[in-house]
């Protein structure tokens, strides 16, 4: 099914973000786990099923990050692997009516690792990270941050337009992190400095709770005032139902 996976992956990214720029696409069964180059990728000959889809989709996703949007992966690995991991999650959920759809991540389970005070920040260059932390900091934490931004802060419509615009504006150029941050804010029409600061520039922890509940003028018929407090430094919107 390699050809099917290659076709579906490229068509998804071309339709959702920006058209695939090369006249051909080649997926080679090789000895390595997975590696990408312009127009050609290498995937393990042993991979099959969900594993083959995952590596094929991931390696072709790199055509968009960092080949079309030419970020400096040696300095900012998250703008390469993190962005690609994020768009892979959307592609996987859509492929063949959800054949390999991911289970929602348990962010409560991941939070301890994501916000450890011993962890370097996402903005650290990969060569300044402990090797054991590169997967988390370059792939998973930035991808989770984009999921939070899409699902909890901006909403799918605003976020998808903002990311598509970022790709279009910076295609075949070399953006820095601030170029990404400012483009998302510009298109979304919202100051997100509080989010970039907490999730990307620091490892701030999210801990929110209800501080107090009071009736308006002590009269339940007039409604209730609920006060929410941040017990840690990270901020996030809260919905009360």
Predicted segment positions?
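Juxtacatalytic substrate-recognition/specificity segment
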Residues: 1-79, 83-87, 95-96, 128-133
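Extracytoplasmic/secreted proteins, especially bacterial periplasmic and envelope-associated proteins
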Residues: 4-8, 12, 38, 51, ...
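A generic secondary-structure signal for well-formed alpha-helical elements
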Residues: 17-21, 63-68, 72, 86-95, ...
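Short loop/turn segments at connectors of secondary-structure elements within structured domains
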Residues: 21, 234-236
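Acidic/His/Gly-enriched intrinsically disordered linker/tail segments
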Residues: 75, 81-153
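Amphipathic alpha-helical substructures
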Residues: 135-226
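Asparagine-centered strand-capping/turn motif at beta-strand->loop junctions
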Residues: 228-232
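Extended low-complexity, serine/threonine- and proline-enriched intrinsically disordered segments
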Residues: 238-241
